[in-house]
UniProtKB/Swiss-Prot annotation:
GO biological process, one term: cell adhesion
Assembly behavior: Homodimer. Interacts with ITGA4:ITGB1. Interacts with spectrins SPTA1 and SPTB1.
Signal sequence coordinates: 1-25
Native species: Rattus norvegicus (Rat)
Record SUPFAM superfamilies: Immunoglobulin
Superkingdom field: Eukaryota
Protein name, as recorded: Basal cell adhesion molecule
Domain Ig-like C2-type: residue ranges: 268-343, 357-436, 443-534
Compositional bias segments (type: Basic and acidic residues): 587-601
Amino acid sequence: MEPPDARAGLLWLTLLLSGYSGAQAELHVSVPPRVEVMRGEQIALDCTPREHPENYVLEWLLVDASGARHRLASVEPQGSEFLGTIHNSRGRRPPYKIDSLGRLVIAEAQVGDERDYVCVVKAGAAGTSEATSSVRVFATPEATEVAPNKGTLSVMEQFAQEIATCSSNNGNPVPRITWYQNGQRLDVPMELNSKGYMTSRTVREASGLYSLTSTLYLRLHKEDRDASFHCAAHYDLPSGQHGRLDSHTFRLTLHYPTEHVEFWVGSPSTTEGWVREGDAVQLLCQGDGSPSPEYSFFREQGNQEEQLNVNLKGNLTLEGVHRSQSGIYGCRVEDYDADEEVQLVKKLKLHVAYLDPLELSVPEEFSVFLNSSGTVVNCSARGLPAPIVRWTKDSVTVADGPILSLDSVTFDSAGTYTCEASTPTVPLLSRTQSFQLVVQGAPELKPNEIKPKSGTSWTEGDEVMLTCSARGFPEPKLTWSQRGDTTPAEPPFEGRGWMSSSLTLKVTSALSREGVSCEASNIHGKNGHVFHFGSVAPQTAQAGVAVMAVAVSVGLLLLVVAAFYCMRRKGRPGCCQRAEKGAPPAREPELSHSGSERPEHTGLLMGGPSGGGRGGNGGFGDEC
């Protein structure tokens, strides 16, 4: 078997000899002019003669950076198949290969495969032709990284300062970097100038990939203190596509002088600057410079300044502020970079509101007499600002001002009186003080009038409940003129201090004449009331019923006695019958059961113990 190179040589010789056998024809070769793939993908380069000659040989040549050509492989058609030969892979891993369709296969494309590949077709008499296919390998860069300047940048600098450096690594082709401020693209040139510019540097890595770094320089202003910055890397993809990778956003630390100072009371206060005595009061001072300067707090004492505190936070707390701490306070911003025209000292006047405990001109329990007048109670309220005073009783205002006048005092006047003092300009600053008014006097009595059940008059035996209510001080005692079922009762009247007693009894004729009285008494006197019942009707209907009941009872008793007698006289027939008839028959001899003329118990029905009952007046007129 001949080696491949020998066979190829014979084929070339055959094609060369056949080229002289006839006229040379024109030959055309078809290859993809540009092949674009992502790094790591496979490339298959196809080369086809358009005229389809019967015998031909094609070769793949690699054009290096200097333009020199290097033979990589050759392909011979054998019927419907192709015989490929790799002549030189030039150290590539994995090496080139020819597939079953006669294509040059470049596996796992790398950036180094970006070359021109020339396909040369030799077809003997048909001629020789070639075509070039350019391979482009794209690689997406790594995530975009930004390194901001972590120092403090001064807005007073007259030149652009370094803002940040942005990096986009290992991409192909070389990516492009743009800068953004607050989401808007910055149009900065590459040339050095005082307002802003950027520089860039490209590095080709050992892998053949490219890394790009860009540094941004800007002249900063105070308005940039809250600005956000970021960068973005733009890269190309196959088929004219593009990609973008944004970095994270960042902010800068700027140094700028103070232009304005504010000083105010931070804790709850009124618009007039009042604060409550005893509260923790915060004084806040704020300058708009950066970084935060020192704040010096002081209090004016005549023509002198009393130094209170120096800090970087800009706040001063007065714990449990006292009325003596009212006065003028100041804050000084220690910023030596500030313009001379800037007012770095601010002052305010602190007003400490207070309200002393209220003082009443009467003790906590105060007594007056019923119907008295001219009593005055004074409520003394001292505070700043001047408090407003009013008197209330049962949450109802009874007097405006510190003076409470008690005139025409009644028992309803008794109760709890409260003096309320408040300062409308200072919320929650208020005080109260109360006293108990006691009204002394003879009892006041109120009866609960009653009406007959029938509506017009009382009937003897009706049950009635009488109620008397009284009030006074000391508490009165309620007594009744009649005995009965006495119980405490709920007062039926509205008002303060009432007490009640109820008496339950039956109506009689005697009550109608005398009446029933209740009396309330205490050390100051007594008061009474008599309940009258008017005429009391007798129980007529009930008397008739009683008489009838007695008559029926007597009749029943007589019948029982008669029945008993008849039972005793069963031995004498006709006796009871004669007794039932009106006239006695002619007398006949009487025989007892024992045969004697006189029965043993005859005396039971006779008028006397002698038994002489015949025609006598002491019995029922007959033995029967």
